[in-house]
UniProtKB/Swiss-Prot annotation:
Origin species: Arabidopsis thaliana (Mouse-ear cress)
Gene Ontology annotations for the cellular component aspect, listed alphabetically: endoplasmic reticulum membrane; Golgi apparatus; Golgi trans cisterna
Localization, UniProt: Endoplasmic reticulum membrane
Protein name as it appears in the record: Probable methyltransferase PMT5
Lineage: Eukaryota, Viridiplantae, Streptophyta, Embryophyta, Tracheophyta
Residue ranges that the UniProt entry lists as topological domain Lumenal: 42-606
Length: 606
């Protein structure tokens, strides 16, 4: 009698031969691990006198947990689920960002700003569904036109929110019938964003804002970036700004900045450290960012100090910076006054002040900290831990780091001698770029030849390298003159190469791919990952959930390029079909077991 076991086996034989063989092999290994786990655990228990036993047991338990996750995923594939596409999510998830449930956080007892933080631990059971775009969504305009004009239906903002916005970065923009237009001169303080940037340059001692790089300023952390006007100007100066702002259900600064093709991500530091290592940025900028700097034992300002490089600058602009009263001895209660009092305790110096803008410079001499009074803020005992949303600390970080190098003294171009530079650099980029064409999705796909036209240099703008290593894909894009920027993501359990990426002047962040990425849906044009799937095989992650997350952050008609071992790529192709991507596996023809999976997300309209 043919029971459920026979049907399961029959469904496996219905899959493609390569997937079928792979599934049998992996399921067999998982079953063997599950059967032998108790025996192995007992053998370790019998030698409990060894100090290694707790670590061995903990690591083995982690393997068993991962085996269970893999088994469930493989079982669903073996039962024919690979032929079943994920359902579409409801309308309420069109702008859904996981891990930011303010209502749920309040119910959990979080308050004083912590309810606005990222809390993946409170996520309910995941609903496996594909997030659809809004009914009036349109493909963004190509860069640079898309920097100044975006479709209003692509962002979640009401007309009243737009018109009532009072931040210094949101003036003189036009909300037309279905477009939002950003002027190059959009009223950012005084006579415009260019004048504002020039003023900051003069406060540093430069002739103009075109000389920022000469002063060592290449990377800028922009806190509360409004609609991205300041960041857009810095991009035009070939600098790398990264906008961070708290999660907003509507009228999001981060969503608007990314829609304009500007680097941004959801982030705040009310109670947790930012996912960047110490000494990451050359400048931190806050223009009416709404931060109260002197609360929580000044830990918010200490977090700015942690990510600021030696010799770097902190720019604070706010109308409340003006002193109250006209007499010299009038007691000042402005934000800048309170920050200045704290700055003396952390070896910052007030370099300049003009109107509502104040500029502090962090010391480049680490001996300054030992010469302070005993009442000053203590130094942290810096370790090797990765700063991935750790609690804020009431101490000064990075003073003993080998990367303590003044931004004015470092080499003009930081790089790496990695052997992977050539493998994952220009040659790989040319290979990938030639594949971004509808030719591979024809009935007879082929590798484009020299006679085939390449995609335009500006067909994509927002790129995410999900396993960035040293940022070599980013470097290759720049060398080839592509009009794209890259969010270089370093997995938390991989080698921490983010300091190298940031020292090269690129954007980057630490992230755990077992969790959703802190961004809004449809914010990236291309996702790239080299051997990420193999790396995640040792983590407690579900590849199904990873592909759903990739689909969430990828815009319609966006691209995915995955490079990995042939077995993993075959499994990835099955998952790509479940999220409705058009996919092709490309043999690199180099004698290795590496394959490319090139996918394009279709634009499925309602």
């Amino acid at each position: 009698m043919r029971g459920s076991w026979y049907k399961s086996v029959s469904s496996v034989f219905g899959l493609r031969p390569r997937i079928r063989g792979l599934l049998f092999f992996i399921v067999g290994v998982v079953a063997l691990v599950t059967i032998l786990a108790p025996l192995t655990s007992n053998s370790y228990d019998s030698s409990s006198s060894s100090t290694l036993v707790p670590n061995i047991y903990s690591n083995y338990r982690r393997i068993k947990e991962q085996a269970a996750v893999d088994y469930l995923d493989l079982r669903s594939l073996s039962l024919g689920a690979s032929l079943k596409e994920f359902p579409f999510c409801g309308k309420e998830r069109e702008s859904y960002v996981p891990c930011y449930n303010i209502t749920g956080n309040l119910l959990a007892g979080l308050q004083e700003g912590e309810e606005l933080d990222r809390h993946c631990e409170f996520e309910r059971e995941k609903e496996r569904c594909v997030v659809r775009p809004p009914r009036d969504y349109k493909i963004p305009l190509r860069w640079p036109l898309g920097r100044d004009i975006i479709w209003s239906g692509n962002v979640k903002i009401t007309k009243d929110q737009f018109l009532s916005s009072g931040t210094v970065t949101t003036r003189l923009m036009l909300l037309e019938e279905n477009q939002i237009t950003f002027h190059s001169e959009d009223g950012l303080v005084f006579d415009g964003v260019k004048d504002y940037a020039r003023q900051i340059a003069e406060m540093i001692g430069l002739g103009s804002d075109t000389e920022f790089a000469q002063a060592g300023v290449r990377t800028v952390l922009d806190i509360g970036c409004g609609f991205g006007s300041f960041g857009a100007h810095l991009v035009s100066l070939k600098l790398m700004p990264i906008c961070i702002a708290e999660y907003e259900a509507t009228g999001s600064q981060v969503q608007l900045a990314l829609e304009r093709g500007l680097p941004a991500m959801i982030g705040n530091f009310f109670s947790k450290q930012l996912p960047y290592p110490a000494l990451s940025f050359d400048m931190v900028h806050c223009a009416q960012c709404g931060t109260t700097w002197d609360i929580k034992d000044a830990m918010l300002l200490l977090e700015v100090d942690r990510v600021l490089k030696p010799g770097g600058y902190f720019v604070l602009t706010s109308p409340t910076n003006k002193a109250q009263g006209n007499l010299p001895d009038t007691k000042k209660t402005s934000i800048s006054t309170r920050v200045n009092e704290l700055s003396k305790k952390i070896c910052w110096s007030l370099t300049a002040q003009q109107d509502e803008t104040f500029l502090w410079q962090k010391t480049s001499d680490s001996s300054c900290y030992s010469s302070r009074s005993q009442a000053s803020i203590p130094l942290c005992k810096d370790g090797d831990s990765v700063p991935y949303y750790h609690p804020l600390v009431p101490c000064i970080s990075g003073t003993t780091s080998k990367r303590w190098i003044s931004i004015q003294n470092r080499s003009a171009v930081a790089g790496t001698t990695s052997a992977g530079l050539e493998i994952h650099g220009k040659s790989a980029l040319k290979n990938y770029w030639s594949l971004l064409t509808p030719l591979i999705f024809s009935d007879h796909p082929k590798r484009p030849g020299d006679e085939d036209p390449l995609p335009p240099f500006n067909m994509i703008r927002n790129v995410m390298d999900m396993h960035a290593r040293f940022g070599n894909l980013n470097a290759a894009l720049l060398d080839e003159g592509k009009s794209a920027w890259v969010m270089n993501v370093v997995p938390v359990n991989a080698r921490n190469t983010l300091p190298i990426i940031l020292d090269r002047g690129f954007a980057g962040v630490l992230h755990d791919w077992c969790e959703p990425f802190p961004t809004y849906p449809r914010t990236y044009d291309m996702l790239h990952a080299n051997e990420l799937l193999t790396h995640l095989s040792s983590e407690r992650c579900s590849l199904m959930d990873l592909f759903l997350e990739m689909d969430r952050i990828l815009r319609p008609e966006g691209w995915v390029v995955l490079s990995d071992k042939v077995g993993v790529i075959e499994m990835a192709r099955a998952l790509a079909a479940r999220v409705r991507w058009e996919a092709r596996v490309i043999d690199l023809q180099d004698g290795s077991d590496q394959r490319l999976l090139v996918c394009q997300k279709p634009f499925i309209k309602k």
